[in-house]
Swiss-Prot record:
This is ATP phosphoribosyltransferase. Belongs to the ATP phosphoribosyltransferase family. Long subfamily. GO terms for molecular function: ATP binding; ATP phosphoribosyltransferase activity; magnesium ion binding. It comes from Methanococcoides burtonii (strain DSM 6242 / NBRC 107633 / OCM 468 / ACE-M). GO terms for biological process: L-histidine biosynthetic process. Pathway: Amino-acid biosynthesis; L-histidine biosynthesis; L-histidine from 5-phospho-alpha-D-ribose 1-diphosphate: step 1/9. Its main location: cytoplasm. It catalyses: 1-(5-phospho-beta-D-ribosyl)-ATP + diphosphate = 5-phospho-alpha-D-ribose 1-diphosphate + ATP. It is an enzyme of class 2 (transferase). Its EC number is 2.4.2.17. Keywords: Amino-acid biosynthesis, ATP-binding, Cytoplasm, Glycosyltransferase, Histidine biosynthesis, Magnesium, Metal-binding, Nucleotide-binding, Transferase.
Length: 284
């Protein structure tokens, strides 16, 4: 049995549930109020846990695989197999001070207090800079601490910076960049082939999000021109259409970020009846 630990709440919960659903491993009959949930594979089950606990759960073998933030893995210094950067949930740990503060860099904080939910990362960051600070560990509402005299600055997670601005704080330095990772227990990763299958399934979703499937018709006389526009993964697929005219159907996979320009070129080359479709999964 493979146990996958996933965040039981917070900003990572829903995107993680959705990604596994798209990968073909939906949560069955479970919710974040339960400890466990089944999947459509009898050998795989989900374990709902605090995102901060998942690195150590995986390290210690309580879970075989986990989904959590790189910031939390670094904070706990957990010894786990880093299988895959899932490219969502990106955020930065930033050093921030009150808007009216004269502090403009980490160097100005020598001998001062820095509040954070990430004391490990914060202490290592300032140690590497050769700056002595007092780390004030908090469990939430970190933004409040400079305004009530508990700290001179904070190190906090920020996705857009909106919360900091709302609380009259300004970012002076970026401490750490984080995204969401698929991790595994070292020993289990060596022996369980199904862990590689899970990784492949999630990779297929990631690859598909960046691609689009194009279908179109075109006169057979412009096929060479279309090939120049549509290299595809291994070249476009071209099929004869049963028609009174010499028409072919052309299929190709293209990068999503060039769809607009590609369609313009295809129309100019003579393609018509162009369809653009999302791809659910794409396995190399």
């Amino acid at each position: 049995m493979i146990r996958i630990a996933i965040p039981n709440k917070g900003r990572l919960h829903e995107p993680t549930i959705q990604m596994f659903k798209e990968a073909g491993l939906p949560v069955l009959g479970g919710s974040n109020r339960k400890l466990f949930a089944k999947t459509n594979d009898p050998e795989i089950t989900f374990l709902f846990a605090r995102a901060a606990d998942i690195p150590e759960y995986v390290q210690d073998g309580a879970a075989d695989v986990g989904i959590t933030g790189l910031d939390l893995i670094s904070e706990t210094e957990s010894d786990v197999e880093m299988l895959l950067d899932l490219k969502y949930g990106g955020a930065d740990l930033v050093l921030a001070v009150p808007e009216e503060s004269d502090i403009s860099s980490a160097n100005d904080l020598d001998g001062m207090r820095v509040a954070t939910e990430f004391p490990g990362i914060t202490a290592r960051y300032f140690k590497d800079l050769g700056i002595k600070i007092d780390v004030v560990k908090v469990s939430g509402a970190c933004e409040m601490t400079p305004h009530v005299g508990i700290a001179d600055a904070i190190v906090d997670i920020s996705s857009s910076g909106t919360t900091l601005v709302m609380n009259h704080l300004k970012v002076i330095e970026k401490v750490f960049s984080s995204s969401i990772y698929l991790i595994a227990n070292h020993e289990t990763a060596k022996t369980e082939e199904k862990i590689e299958h899970i990784k492949t399934a999630l990779e297929s979703v990631m690859h598909a999000k960046a691609k689009r499937y194009l279908m179109m018709n075109a006169p057979i006389t412009v096929v060479d021109d279309l090939k120049e526009v549509l290299p595809g993964l291994a070249g476009p697929t071209i099929m004869k259409v049963e028609s009174k005219e010499d028409i072919v159907a052309v299929h190709a996979v293209v990068d999503a970020d060039i769809i607009f320009a590609t369609i313009t070129k295809l129309k100019a080359a003579g393609a018509f009846d162009i369809l653009v479709m999302p791809i659910e999964r794409m396995i190399p």
